[in-house]
Regions:
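Alpha-helical membrane-protein topology signature
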Residues: 1-239
Length: 239
């Protein structure tokens, strides 16, 4: 457990460094997210596992719903700025879920009806929301420092097995995963430099290493493997 007020005091004491690292991190975050949408539409394949999409969406929505906490209880510019930054990411994560629905039936439930697949996607979203809010109630992470790092790790550890199973790079690209590496490095660097000894532990650094190593693997795989043509979504012609 960390002291959130000590972290916010450190942010204020090192505001130039924090803004520099934070700006770079968020730029790569948006680069990673937007590139993934482009890749998914290009290849007609959802870029992220539904499990990851639903938890990301639930994570960011939960932060947005805590408006009074950030603007009332804490009333600190960093937490308020993060709130604003998560509005577009939440919208993008909703697009990811839509891409799973639009492109994913033939991969995930090829023998099922469209109605059954619709129910599956909706149930996954509800399960993600329920699961996240349940877990969050037990986490000692009041200002979402730990979970921002972990949710990134979730993206790469669910992407690797899916890529190996498909044996193609549909929905992926070198640029996308380079953005991921720099995004995660920016966040973990910020926490290690400014957020105190809780974020200077071997376990935290191991999580950072796992993100970077996984990102490097995805860069190499995206370069080597070509996006194989996938079945068109229902009602759309294959090109």
């Amino acid at each position: 457990m960390y002291d959130s007020h000590q972290i916010l005091a450190s942010v204020d004491a090192h505001i130039t460094l924090f803004l520099a690292l934070g700006t770079v991190t968020m730029l790569f975050n948006y680069g990673f997210f937007i590139t993934a949408i482009i890749n998914g539409n290009r290849d007609r394949a959802f870029p992220f596992a539904l499990f990851a999409c639903t938890l990301w969406f639930a994570h960011d929505i939960s932060y947005l719903l805590m408006f009074h906490t950030w603007f009332g209880t804490y009333h600190h510019w960093y937490l308020e700025l993060f709130w604003a930054a998560l509005i577009p990411t939440s919208a993008i994560e909703a697009i990811y879920i839509f891409q799973v629905w639009r492109f994913g039936k033939d991969e995930l439930m090829p023998k099922s009806s469209q109605a059954a697949f619709n129910f599956y996607v909706l149930a996954a979203v509800l399960a993600g929301l329920l699961g996240w809010f349940s877990v969050k109630s037990f986490l000692a992470d009041p200002i979402y420092v730990y979970t921002f790092g972990c949710t990134g790790f979730l993206g790469v550890v669910t992407a690797i097995p899916r890529l190996l199973r498909r044996r193609d790079a549909a929905g992926q690209s070198v640029a996308m995963w380079l953005c991921f590496i720099f995004m995660q490095t920016g966040w973990f660097s910020t926490t290690a430099l400014l957020f105190g000894p809780v974020f200077q532990t071997p376990l935290w650094f191991a999580l950072w290493f796992g993100c970077v190593a996984g990102g490097i693997f995805m860069v190499a795989a995206s370069r080597k493997l070509k996006p194989a043509p996938t079945l068109a979504p229902r009602g759309l012609p294959q090109t």
